[in-house]
C-alpha cells in the first residue's frame, strides 16, 4: 500500500547538469540580480524626479520597473541560497508562495506590455486625442487592471495546482516551484490542470502578443505616413525599444509553456533568461535610445554619486 503521508516540504534539485559550477553560477546570477535591482531602481528615480517624464508612457514604465524588481526576487534569492551551499529544501507554504507570486507578477507584466502597446498605438495613431483617451484616470484604471487580472490569473492557477494531493516524491527537478514540475509530484490525475495550465499560461500570453502585433502593425503604418524624418526616427526609436522588451519577455514564455516535449535543462536556461536577464536589460533598452530618460538618469546619478552634471 502507498504511503499517503502529506508532503510538508519540497527539495529543489536546481538547474540540471550544473554540478561542480555552483560557485561560478552564484557569482554570475548574483551579479545579474544586483544589476537588475539597481538598474530598475535608477529608472524609477529618474522618472519620479523629472516632471518632464510624468506622462502615461513613463507612468507604465514605472510600473514595469516595479514588476522587474519583484519578479526576479521570487526565485533568485532561494536559488542563490542553495547555490552557495545551503539546503535546497523549501516549505510547502514557500512553494505555494513562489508559484503564486511568479504567475501574479508574470501575468501582470504580460497585461502591462499589452497596455503599453495600446498607449503607443493611441499616441502615434491618434495624437490629437491622446491626452483625452489616456487621461490620468484611465491610466490609473489600466495600471490597476493589469495587477487585478494578474492576481486573478495567479490565484486560479495556484488553487488548481495545490488542491491536488501531494503525498509521494518531493524532489522538484527545477530551481523554483512552477506548475509543470510541481504537478508531476501530485498523487492524482493532473490532466485537467495540464489542459487549464496550457490555456491560461500558454495561450493567454500568445493572445496578448497577437494583440500587441496588431497594435504595432497599425503603428508602423502610421509612422510611415509621417512626413518629417526626425518625427519618423523618434517614433521608431521609442517603439523599437518597447518592441524589443516585448520580444525578450514573450518569446521565453511561449517557448517554455507551449512546447510539446519539455527539456528540464533547456527550460531552466530559458527561464533564467526570462527571470533574470530580461528584467536586467529593460532599463538599458528604455534608456539608451531615450535622451529624456538619459538626461534624468544622469541627474539622479549626479545627486547620488557626485558625478558631473553634464555628459
UniProtKB/Swiss-Prot annotation:
A biological-process GO annotation: G protein-coupled receptor signaling pathway
Keywords: Cell membrane, Disulfide bond, G-protein coupled receptor, Membrane, Olfaction, Receptor, Sensory transduction, Transducer, Transmembrane, Transmembrane helix
Membrane side Cytoplasmic: residue ranges: 46-54, 117-137, 214-237, 289-311
Pfam families attached to this UniProt entry: 7tm_4
Membrane topology term: Multi-pass membrane protein
Gene3D superfamilies per record: Rhodopsin 7-helix transmembrane proteins (1.20.1070.10)
Transmembrane portions of the chain: 25-45, 55-75, 96-116, 138-158, 193-213, 238-258, 272-288
GO cellular component: membrane; plasma membrane
Cystine crosslinks: 95-187
Regions of this protein lying in the Extracellular compartment: 1-24, 76-95, 159-192, 259-271
The UniProt record lists the keyword Transmembrane helix: yes
Tagged with keyword Disulfide bond: yes
Gene Ontology molecular function, alphabetical: G protein-coupled receptor activity; olfactory receptor activity
InterPro entries registered for this protein in UniProt: GPCR_Rhodpsn, GPCR_Rhodpsn_7TM, Olfact_rcpt
Subcellular location: Cell membrane
Function statement: Odorant receptor.
Similarity comment: Belongs to the G-protein coupled receptor 1 family.
Protein name (record): Olfactory receptor 10D1B
Organism: Mus musculus (Mouse)
Amino acid at each position: 500500500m502507498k504511503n499517503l503521508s502529506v508532503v510538508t516540504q519540497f527539495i529543489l534539485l536546481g538547474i540540471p547538469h550544473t554540478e561542480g559550477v555552483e560557485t561560478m553560477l552564484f557569482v554570475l546570477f548574483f551579479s545579474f540580480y544586483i544589476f537588475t535591482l539597481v538598474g530598475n531602481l535608477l529608472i524609477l528615480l529618474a522618472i519620479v524626479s523629472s516632471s518632464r517624464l510624468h506622462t502615461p508612457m513613463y507612468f507604465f514604465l514605472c510600473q514595469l520597473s516595479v514588476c522587474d524588481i519583484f519578479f526576479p526576487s521570487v526565485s533568485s534569492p532561494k536559488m542563490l541560497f542553495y547555490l552557495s551551499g545551503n539546503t535546497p529544501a523549501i516549505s510547502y507554504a514557500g512553494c505555494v508562495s513562489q508559484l503564486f507570486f511568479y504567475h501574479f507578477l508574470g501575468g501582470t507584466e504580460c497585461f502591462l506590455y499589452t497596455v503599453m502597446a495600446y498607449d503607443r498605438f493611441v499616441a502615434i495613431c491618434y495624437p490629437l486625442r491622446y491626452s483625452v483617451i489616456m487621461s490620468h484616470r484611465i491610466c490609473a484604471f489600466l495600471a490597476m487592471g493589469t495587477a487585478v487580472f494578474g492576481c486573478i490569473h495567479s490565484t486560479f492557477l495556484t488553487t488548481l495546482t495545490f488542491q491536488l494531493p501531494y503525498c509521494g516524491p518531493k524532489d522538484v527537478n527545477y530551481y523554483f516551484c512552477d506548475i509543470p514540475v510541481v504537478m508531476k509530484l501530485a498523487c492524482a490525475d493532473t490532466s485537467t490542470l495540464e489542459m487549464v495550465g496550457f490555456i491560461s499560461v500558454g495561450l493567454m500570453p500568445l493572445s496578448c502578443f497577437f494583440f500587441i502585433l496588431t497594435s504595432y502593425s497599425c503603428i508602423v503604418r502610421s509612422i510611415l505616413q509621417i512626413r518629417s524624418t526626425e518625427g519618423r526616427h523618434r517614433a521608431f526609436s521609442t517603439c523599437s525599444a518597447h518592441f524589443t522588451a516585448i520580444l525578450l519577455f514573450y518569446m521565453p514564455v511561449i517557448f517554455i509553456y507551449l512546447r510539446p516535449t519539455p527539456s528540464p535543462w533547456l527550460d531552466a536556461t530559458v527561464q533564467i533568461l526570462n527571470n533574470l536577464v530580461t528584467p536586467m536589460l529593460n532599463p538599458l533598452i528604455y534608456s539608451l535610445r531615450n535622451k529624456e530618460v538619459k538626461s534624468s538618469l544622469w541627474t539622479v546619478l549626479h545627486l547620488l554619486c557626485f558625478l558631473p552634471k553634464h555628459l
